[in-house]
């Protein structure tokens, strides 16, 4: 049964620890396994994507696949008299592993906008060079170089892994035959890894590395390789009250302060080398042209160097190069700045309140409802991202469990999750935007089915399946490529999730 907040059972070590004390004296153990499979899909619509020579369509779908074949957990309780001593180990957070074989839309957007900016710079440089030489020039804007339309190609990949391992220890005390309390703590070890790249970038027919560092074919590559680790502790308290056919419970987990330390080996292009390499290329090409025109080699080289120097001194060229550098650096920082080596990243786990009510109208039938609140807006995240949420996460659930006979029990349940995501329209400012295609959530509804086979009074075997129906979250951003010329970049986020589970409960 998905709604377990008010249930009395060994899984209450996690859901309702105060209620576990109402189990009989002795040892209680539950060993569980889950298999999870998830698709994450972002559909991006951006007119510049039609400039991708290998896939000139928009909207474009970027799909990630996450598969976790083994997600283990165990719960243990030793009950003696009025006391219950408990322990729990589980993956308490993180999204498992997810791979985007073709990268992300945010990565392609950087390439597409850089291609347009590079073509703009090529036109500016060619114009300035033409003024210096007194004739029309098409050196960088020709079809054999960057071209004029912003055409591009690239290869990209993204893989992420997040695991939050939690070990909880605590004790419950039976104040009376109807009322119990719990106190405990959970230690959490977080480990994550992100690896991705954007490489082999071409603008028109020219590899981008040629104007950054012609001696290094990876000079224009973007590569992210970051490991993160952190430790946190969560105090936990709970209460349970039972009367007649009713049971009431509540649990509160305090906010967990978590700081993830980055250990990264990232590769980023240096746009700062652009002027020197443009000068070198212009000098080489012009020297060859002047030599072919009959100038002695030494005079040709001097004239070519003087022309290149004059072009780079042109204020319009300098302004255009600075604009390209600032645009690229800003977009790169937004994409991977969070993963810079040595940074400590705020990643608090929010305070969590759960409340449950259980009712058993007849002995074989149990009906539960529950409520969860995650105080996300007060859990510090990178760049205070949490402040952009409308509210913390709200969850409502309900479930029913029925004993067919002494051997078999069946159950069904439902849960609704609302993440408090803000609306992101074209006019929404950048500092108010929350969604990020590297790690995102959308509100959802989940349904689950379960069954129990009671071998005997000491042992039971459980199986379950649940599916999550995720909503679509759509965002729109207005992108001004040049003054007075804005186009929209839209994203449609969604997921698809399936989980199978099995476990064994033992009393001894």
Predicted regions span which residues?
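Outer-membrane beta-barrel porins/channels
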Residues: 3, 8, 71, 77-508
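N-terminal, post-signal peptide beta-strand-biased segments of exported outer-membrane/organellar beta-barrel
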Residues: 1-100, 106, 112-114, 118-119
